[in-house]
Amino acid sequence: MKLKSLLLRYYPPGIMLEYEKGGELKTKSIDLLELSPSTDVNTLVGEIQQAEPLITASRTKQVRLLVQRLQEKLRQHSDHNFYLFKVLRAHILPLTNVALNKAGSCFITGSYDRTCKVWDTASGEELHTLEGHKNVVYAIAFNNPYGDKIATGSFDKTCKLWSAETGKCYHTFRGHTAEIVCLSFNPQSTVVATGSMDTTAKLWDIQNGEEVVTLTGHLAEIISLSFDTSGDRIITGSFDHTVVVWDASTGRKVHTLIGHCAEISSALFNWDCSLILTGSMDKTCMLWDATSGKYVATLTGHDDEILDSCFDYTGKLIATASADGTARVYNATTRKCVTKLEGHEGEISKISFNPQGNRLLTGSSDKTARIWDVQTGQCLQVLEGHTDEIFSCAFNYKGNIVITGSKDNSCRIWR
């Protein structure tokens, strides 16, 4: 085995190794999920070299520099103050969702006007209008990290695949018998998965446009789906109160997670795929062992439905957003509530961590989005100006741009 090159992955922090084995080029990753700006670099480099035989003494200096660069990234933009950069009167009817490509260079908006629009983040200019759906465009996504394709899921029961560069439609995926309300690309960008009100999810081949497999078994609509980091498994959350883990290649049901007593609002894996987090209208989140499917813990404290939940990039922290107008941060290991975020005057429908993991972004029906300090729970900034409910908001991959989408038909770029 011969080490060819070392590459960086910023969020979550890691070093990718490209090496040659038996004439073949292979890759493996060293995950540095515990890395913080205060980590002692020399100690960590020593630990990395002990654990990874490919990294010999001659690479010590290079690895030290890489770890220092990762630390710099964790410090970057962490005290960023956002200002309103652009208001885009994006659509003639309300927006449904916003999504950014990994580079943050462009973003997309879905709307009740049956279109999806592609925007240039730097200028706020419209690049393309993706037309062709015959009903609301509800679920939208880029095939990150590549960002060269866009998927749109519609109430017209179809999903379309588009070129992000030209706006050309590659495929229309037909087969669902009711509205498509969620979708996701697998990490390899070879498959797109769609979840529907028809109680099924379908996986589609991006190259040939064919249906790969249908995931059947839920008794009510599927409103949440996501792949694990490897793309081998997919989870679906349903209004039937259950979450199912499936084998993505065969469509076989691996586990059914039963425990919630109301509709599921979100379901996702943590980074290392050891845990599954499920949020529900029963006011709780639950944690499950991703390998065995066994129940691990319940996160309690909210007084109303949980509308969104997420892990930070490393999987150490969990954030929950509720109709009770508060958000909470939990430690994923101890399952204790670390901080409570109070200040919104309406339900919080969206929550996400910045890539560095020290800030949270929330969007609310009180027409504001807010930036919070994860450790203290203090509100650092209120992003004001929308004249109706904010139901979609997102950080870019660097954490220095925020996009908000509102029922007021506009979206705003904050930077």
Swiss-Prot record:
GO terms, biological process: cerebrospinal fluid circulation; determination of left/right symmetry; epithelial cilium movement involved in extracellular fluid movement; establishment of localization in cell; heart development; intraciliary transport; outer dynein arm assembly
One Gene Ontology cellular component: cytoplasm
Domain of life: Eukaryota
Tissue: In early mouse embryos, expression is limited to distal, motile ciliated cells of the node.
The entry's keywords: Cell projection, Cilium, Cytoplasm, Cytoskeleton, Flagellum, Repeat, WD repeat
Residue windows of the WD repeats: 90-129, 132-174, 175-214, 217-256, 259-298, 301-340, 343-384, 386-415
Pfam family, one: WD40
Record's subcellular location: Cytoplasm, Cytoskeleton, Flagellum basal body; Cytoplasm, Cytoskeleton, Flagellum axoneme
PANTHER family: F-BOX AND WD REPEAT DOMAIN CONTAINING 7, WD40 REPEAT PROTEIN
Similarity comment: family membership: Belongs to the WD repeat WDR69 family.
UniProt function note: Required for axonemal dynein assembly and ciliary motility in ciliated organs, including Kupffer's vesicle, during embryogenesis. Facilitates the onset of robust cilia motility during development.
Protein name (record): Dynein assembly factor with WD repeat domains 1
